[in-house]
Amino acid sequence: MTKQIITLVGRPNVGKSTLFNRLSIRKKAIVHDLPGVTRDRKYTDGKIGSFEFLLIDTPGLDEHPNSMGKRLIEQTTKAILEADLICFMVDARSGILPDDKLLSSFVRKYNKPAILVVNKCEKAFDFDKEYYKLGFDSMIAISAEHGTGLIDLYDEIIAKLPEEESIETNIADPIKGDCLQIVVSGRPNAGKSTFINALINDERLLTGPEAGITRESIEIDWQYKNNHIKLIDTAGLRKKSTITESLEKLSASDTINSIKLANTVILMIDALAPLKQQDLNIASHVVNEGRSIVIVVNKWDLVKESEKEAFQEEFYYQINTHLPQVKGIPVLFISAINKQNIEQVLDACLKIYKIWNKKITTSKLNEWLNFTTEAHLLPLQKGGRRVRVKYMTQTKTRPPTFKLFSNNPEKITDSYTRYLVNNMREAFDMPGVPIRFTYVKTKNPYV
């Protein structure tokens, strides 16, 4: 199969060559602080994660219409025409400059799939309105120099490339050729390290009755049913004694970072310790990060047989009540120390990972949308016009994300969105993964 082509475009010195070198299988481009070092379009075989492609680096463009500038524009235009996807790069340190605005208009007129890549984001970064004004519907923050943000870039690339050649190929067998990163998280002393030792049949990780033995995230490469898996044991998450509101203020930043990089998170619960708000906070954080999640109740062998049924009923009630946005999360009851039901956990992880990668064709989506919205109409507005959701498309996977077009998106209530999400989850068999909707106003005022 012919490799997909990704073209890097932007004004001088935004870091195109640095990203080119970062993604290239071999270093090709000269990198220097002097603007305009790259004057030809350069090609290399690129790779991000398991996805390989042809990468093009283009000259930095500015508004000066001299003869050199015209030739640089010709080089860039050819690279844009060749591209299946454009990464339009800007510099977070300098912010949006007039040249960025001119070049974004130049790029958008070719109607190619595009991602706005904000480079040099070594610290936390929030997109302000100036970035949205450039007109791109996908935006990510990275540091090409330090390699941060590349997982988000990978997700956006996979979502944006033509679905019949990239997305469908990956989803048909999402584990093959890929490394499934599974993070084992939870409160201290829930049995995370014991669980991993039982899986790999090796005392690889230090365990004991003391809470908090694991101080940092430990990665273990492993094979399960011909799948390459990276198991990541994390420090137990606990709140600082003075903090009561937000999981983001937990002291275990290493664990939080591991969750951000995970494909699937196993949330380990101690069956002998009541389900606490902290457990639900961790689960909510995983869902908000867009990761898939499997909940595992450990030490099940220590629960009295006469109490197990009531325990399960209460447990499911708490999960469904506090995490209604991800109905159908897999829940398994195990004994890590006795190796009871531990393989079922991995099977659940493989299954939910495939759901997390699920791609639905646009035709099937809109057939479902028409039926579902007609079954439950939105109310009439002033003037007798009804709010309608007329069309939708899937914009990415990991997690499944959808764009819906409406004549009046501001009037669509949260309860109606929940109705659509829950109906979609059932119709397309997508239990237990985050499903994200964004609404866009249709340009046709009569739709």
UniProtKB/Swiss-Prot annotation:
Domain KH-like as annotated: residue spans: 358-443
Coiled coil regions in record: none
Function, as annotated: GTPase that plays an essential role in the late steps of ribosome biogenesis.
Keywords: GTP-binding, Nucleotide-binding, Repeat, Ribosome biogenesis
GO molecular function, one term: GTP binding
EngA-type G domain residues: 4-165, 180-357
Residues engaged in binding GTP 2: 186-193, 233-237, 298-301
One Pfam family, short name: MMR_HSR1
Homology family: Belongs to the TRAFAC class TrmE-Era-EngA-EngB-Septin-like GTPase superfamily. EngA (Der) GTPase family.
Self-association state and partner proteins as the record states: Associates with the 50S ribosomal subunit.
Domain of life of the native organism: Bacteria
Single biological process term from Gene Ontology: ribosome biogenesis
Name of this protein: GTPase Der
Binding positions for GTP 1 per the UniProt entry: 10-17, 57-61, 119-122
Keyword Repeat: yes
